[in-house]
Amino acid sequence: MQYRKQIGWWLMTGVIMIVIQVVLGGITRLTGSGLSITEWKPILGSIPPMNEADWNHAFDLYKTATGQYKYLNADFTLSDFKFIYFWEWLHRNWARFIGVVFLLPFAWFWYKKAFTPEMVPKLIALFVLGIAQGLIGWIMVKSGLTDDNLYVSHIRLAIHFVSALVLLAFTWWFAMDVMIPSSARQSNPSYHRWVTFILGLLLLQLVYGAFMAGLKAASAASTWPDINGSYFPEALKHQNWVNHPIVVHFVHRTLAYVLFAAIIFLSIQSAKMGGSVLWKKWRFFPMILVFIQVLLGIGSVLMATETQRNGFGAFEWAAQIHQIVAMFLVMALLFHLYLVRDQKS
């Protein structure tokens, strides 16, 4: 197919841009910037305040629409507000830019009749997932635009994060399907099932990672290997597996240990397998990433009492890199899942 390589690189550009968007989302959350823009204007919202009067109006909206200002940021100056506004504005505008980078080449490829029939439903799904992600983001922000909440709902935050990862995973899989020759793939049903199981565990872990972020649960137990002096904290008796910071923290740590062991086992199995040069080059990448991820998680917990309000210190850096490595781990495992099929075809 004449345009297959170009379509593949177009999709890979989308993958890179989605990764950047998730990073920007993490920075927006860590700097406390997510509630700074209190309106949702998909088109006109791309234009920031252009003069002092516009800035004061935007600041007044933030003051009146959020409990966050009243109870947490009442000492803010206009300069402070401009800092948090910038990150939320950049996060939203990068999403708009992704839309442009999707639609313009799509129109050109469509005009050139470059798409195969099996690509069309996938492209429609990509478009729907992208639009849905924008809507989910606004629904999340709305949960924080009240007099009672300092932050957005941690449950809606988790939905927003996981839906972004679904979009990333779908685009990444689509790109691999276009770019990787079938000769690079092999069949091993048991290995394929094991990777699928680990991805399921990782999805649950990522949900709890978002809960950790939304509930500020790292600072609720800034100790390791124990959790505030106990390995099985009293809070487990509450059996609130979604809303209690200590319980969420316990689940996130426990899943990390299980995933670490599972991926080490996966790497031992991959070492016994032959395969293409591509496979041999990247088969141990999940193991490397999970080692880094565990260290980052421990470091983030131990530094969680040193958070900077509306700033970026050591904890914020560790937490942000922790999120980035999580995305790479998802992509690495999907790469394994793609290269090692469930059956011959």
Name what the model sees in each region:
Residues 9-46, 200-213:
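N-terminal signal-anchor transmembrane alpha helix
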